[in-house]
A protein has these predicted regions:
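Catalytic histidine neighborhood in serine/cysteine hydrolases
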Residues: 264-282, 289
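Alpha/beta-hydrolase active-site loop
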Residues: 131-152
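Catalytic active-site module of serine/aspartate enzymes centered on a nucleophile-bearing elbow/loop
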Residues: 287-306
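Conserved alpha/beta-hydrolase
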Residues: 108-127
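The serine-hydrolase catalytic nucleophile loop
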Residues: 94-107
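Hydrolase active-site cap/lid region
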Residues: 172-226
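Short beta-strand/loop motif that positions the catalytic acidic residue
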Residues: 239-241, 246-248, 252
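An N-terminal hydrophobic leader/cap segment in hydrolases
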Residues: 4, 10-67
Length: 306
């Protein structure tokens, strides 16, 4: 009997050590993942003919450092080629920076909007120690949107576009903090961060156990004071009154498009959805630029108005 108890204790100890180690490693990879270099993104976008840096730099613009609530500066560029009170705020995805938002900026400025592109927390030239996939980032988005209203007047009309982490950040902002924007465009958001991590763990480690999430979350709380289970757009999307256009390419393996299907079902009208047959993660615009533009224009015309 004593030997069995010793064996049981040893097994339990090994189990705890294993999942504690996995949880710590996973939290490190997720909180401190390697970011793409700005110049690498510029070259990628230029080669794909989605970026003409000289043309972008010739647009009327202001580089602004906006104080975050978390004691760092948010690096933003306000691009204003149009004489209008209509603004788009563009939120990039994880590992990217504001340069990757320029392809959308070109689309929206052609539609008559002015645009704000900015580096998310810990990305590009914005401060911040940890990436939290929308938990703290939503407060920075709130700060950027409030800056637009404070500096361009209370009668401005703001739309927000986000892709991947930026889309999740946008939905969390709209559902938890503020409904100041007129409309939202969500491209390839996850429905819950926990489900997305389970998907990633199962792909890259072949281990999809919920226990890894539990131990990972313990280290999230200890190291960055947030819970991954609170990063859940699906829980708040029904609180958004304004129109939302959901976009998600069906071949996406990183965040399956079923995440967006769930979000769309939960959102109350007005809403619209488009699921392109081509393109991987956040490649809906890259693979279908003209259709993307038509879908966005139709959504704005039908649900917002020009």
């Amino acid at each position: 009997m004593k030997s069995f108890i010793k064996w049981l204790i040893a097994l339990a100890s090994s189990f705890i050590i294993l999942f504690t180690s996995l949880g710590y490693y996973a939290s490190s990879q997720i909180l401190f993942f390697k970011l793409r270099d700005v110049e690498v993104i510029k070259r990628r976008e230029t080669r794909a003919k989605r970026l003409n840096m000289k043309a972008f730099q010739n647009l009327p613009q202001d580089d602004i450092l906006i104080p975050s609530k978390f004691d760092y500066s948010i690096n933003a560029v306000f691009v204003h080629p149009n004489d209008t009170n209509k603004w788009m705020v563009l939120c990039h995805g994880v590992t990217e920076n504001k340069i990757s938002s320029i392809k959308y900026l070109n689309m929206f400025t052609d539609m008559g909007y002015n645009c704000v592109i900015y580096d998310a927390r810990r990305h590009g030239n914005t401060g911040g120690v940890h990436s939290t996939y929308g938990f703290y980032e939503k407060y920075d988005l709130e700060t950027v949107v409030d800056y637009v209203f404070d500096h361009y007047g209370p009668d401005v009309e703001v739309g927000i576009h986000g892709e991947s982490m930026g889309a999740a950040t946008m939905l969390l902002y709209a559902g938890e903090l503020s409904n100041r924007a007129r409309f939202y465009i969500s491209d390839a958001s996850f429905s819950t961060f926990g489900d997305e991590l389970t998907n990633i763990f199962s792909q890259y480690t072949k281990i999809g156990s919920p226990l890894i999430l539990i131990f990972t979350n313990i280290f999230f709380r200890l190291r960055s004071r947030f819970s991954l289970f609170k990063v859940s757009p699906i829980r708040v999307v029904e609180k958004i009154d304004q129109p939302v256009l959901f976009v998600h390419s069906k071949p996406d393996k990183f965040i399956p498009y079923t995440h967006t299907e769930e979000l769309y079902k939960k959102k109350r009208p007005p809403k619209a959805a488009w699921y392109p047959e081509r393109g991987g993660h956040v490649e809906s615009y890259n693979k279908n630029p003209e259709k993307y533009r038509r879908v966005v224009e139709s959504f704005i015309a039908n649900h917002v108005g020009w």
